[in-house]
């Protein structure tokens, strides 16, 4: 994802790769950029590069080497370089092996690590049986969705089914997705990929690259050749990251996006090598009922950075507290 983004998206020309390696393998990789403001605070720092389509900032860390030593070495080199007083990594997983190794390195060598309050996003852990929908949605709602699928089939004259458009070659599916996304409200708001210079090229290059590696999911809810909704996701190891979704607003009353979400869960369960699905979205989709905690990690690289990290973390906590109070009052 990094190379297509750097070639086609804003800020790519100012992005650097922070990496650690040996003569024969990569140990650590994180795209970064120099920043002069962070979360509204004037502060020079080094930050993970989070473009518009990057939903996880966790660095790549070798699974075959000691991650605590890797983190300690990276922090030590950055401190010696004195390039910035602070490294900020946004959208980092709060748990997991990479975060655990960083906290262990913090405990062992005193990195003075700080963390923002975590936010939750929709996630799915594999179940022994495909009970994802029945665990999170009542039977009456599921029956209503099944009825809508049957109604669509009758109206359109063909069964409504989901097709894996990435299997055996994309065959124009990328352009179909771009057209579908640009046909609705995203065109009106200017946020469709086709409406933003270079963004459609980024999507084409990314999708084709992942497809060539057998790591692209592009499921299409269709009635015959009529596309009702499409969903893309990226395979990474034992996980699946949700990416872009679109639906035909002419059929919104039949909830084609939700019908496709149900089929995505079935597709996920039928892939035994996959252990989890990160939707990379908020927690407002009942079908995806598990949660993943995401936070910003602040790694000081100097005495001034230690002070700045503490103040910035306190500011982020205060903002979250005030936002939570406003949300409770408006509920």
Please name every model-derived segment.
Residues 61-64, 124-127, 165, 301:
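Short beta-strand-to-loop capping motifs
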Residues 21, 37-117, 234-299:
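Acyl-donor binding region in acyl/amide transferases
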Residues 1-48, 90-121, 127-253:
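A conserved beta-strand-loop-helix scaffold within acyl/acetyltransferase catalytic domains
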Residues 295-331:
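Membrane-proximal basic amphipathic "stem/tether" segments
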Residues 74-75, 135-143, 311-318:
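Short intrinsically disordered coil segments
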Residues 49-50, 59-64, 118-123, 151-156, ...:
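Short C-terminal domain-edge/linker segments immediately following a structured domain
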Residues 76-79, 133-137, 225, 267-268, ...:
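A general structural signal for short secondary-structure boundary/capping elements
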């Amino acid at each position: 994802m990094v190379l297509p983004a750097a070639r086609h998206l804003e800020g790519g020309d100012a992005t650097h790769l922070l990496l650690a390696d040996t003569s024969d393998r990569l140990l650590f990789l994180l795209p970064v950029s120099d920043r002069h403001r962070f979360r509204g605070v004037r502060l020079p720092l080094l930050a993970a590069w989070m473009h518009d389509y990057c939903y996880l900032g966790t660095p790549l860390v070798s699974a075959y080497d000691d991650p605590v030593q890797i983190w300690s070495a990276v922090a030590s080199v950055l401190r010696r370089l004195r390039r910035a007083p602070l490294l900020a990594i946004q959208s980092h997983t709060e748990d997991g092996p990479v975060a655990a190794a960083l906290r262990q390195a913090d405990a062992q060598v005193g990195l003075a690590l700080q963390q923002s309050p975590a936010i939750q996003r929709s996630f799915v852990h594999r179940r022994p049986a495909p009970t994802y929908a029945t665990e999170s949605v009542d039977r009456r709602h599921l029956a209503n969705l099944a009825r809508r699928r049957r109604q669509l089939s009758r109206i359109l004259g063909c069964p409504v089914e989901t097709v894996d458009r990435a299997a055996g070659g994309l065959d124009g599916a990328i352009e179909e997705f771009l057209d579908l996304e640009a046909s609705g409200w995203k065109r009106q708001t200017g946020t469709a990929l086709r409406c933003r210079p270079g963004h459609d090229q980024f999507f084409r290059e990314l999708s084709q690259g992942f497809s060539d590696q057998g790591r692209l999911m592009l499921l299409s809810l269709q009635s015959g050749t009529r596309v009702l909704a499409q969903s893309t996701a990226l395979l990474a190891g034992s996980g699946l990251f949700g990416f872009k979704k679109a639906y035909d607003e002419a059929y919104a009353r039949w909830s084609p996006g939700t019908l496709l979400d149900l089929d995505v869960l079935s597709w996920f369960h039928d892939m035994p090598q996959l252990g989890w699905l990160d939707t990379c979205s908020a927690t407002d989709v009942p079908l995806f009922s598990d949660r993943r905690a995401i936070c910003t990690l602040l790694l000081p690289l100097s005495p001034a950075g230690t002070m700045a990290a503490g103040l910035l973390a306190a500011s982020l906590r205060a903002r979250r507290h005030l936002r939570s109070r406003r949300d409770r009052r408006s509920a």
